[in-house]
Amino acid sequence: MFRVVHGDITRFKAEAIVNAANKYLEHGGGVAYAIAKAASGDVSEYIRISKEEMRKQIGRDWIEHGEVVVTPPLNLAKNGVKYVIHTVGPYCGGKWDEDKRKKLELAILGALKKADELGVRSIAFPAISAGIYGCPLEEVVKTFKLVVNEFLKSAKNVTDVYLVLYSERDYEVALKVLERDEL
């Protein structure tokens, strides 16, 4: 089941939450900063943990579209979170094209596959690339819906996927996009 919800992803109850990270996992702003702050209290410490895990899991100091890094939830465990899955979406700067859609699909699918591999049943995503990366929210929501619904047809463990939107305005825009797509 794919559902769009209004709320704070750092307080959302899901087994995994996804961080919309930059490729160096520096968590300097937006939802990445909020997740790092909520997980550790000390953003620089969470950056250190993230970079250490990236070197262990990927073998280098950056991740590409579709790659993910998993870190412990630390303080987020109180919400039932078992994993934070970091992925990188495309930078749009207000421009959307097929290349950006493909990169976003890779980011979403990479996180979903990793969650399924980890045995996760519920996973919460922010609107990857729709914030400071400047991708149009409407296109991000459409891409999420298509990728998630296709993935759920063959998922072994993941059953519940949430797109968690912090602002009321973004939530209402997303609902309108989904309603239009249903017609």
Swiss-Prot record:
SUPFAM superfamilies per record: Macro domain-like
Macro domain span: 1-182
Top-level taxon of origin: Archaea
PROSITE patterns reported for this sequence: MACRO (PS51154)
Listed NCBIfam families: PRK00431.1-3 (NF001662)
Protein name: Uncharacterized protein PYRAB06560
Annotated source species: Pyrococcus abyssi (strain GE5 / Orsay)
Species classification: Archaea, Methanobacteriati, Methanobacteriota, Thermococci, Thermococcales
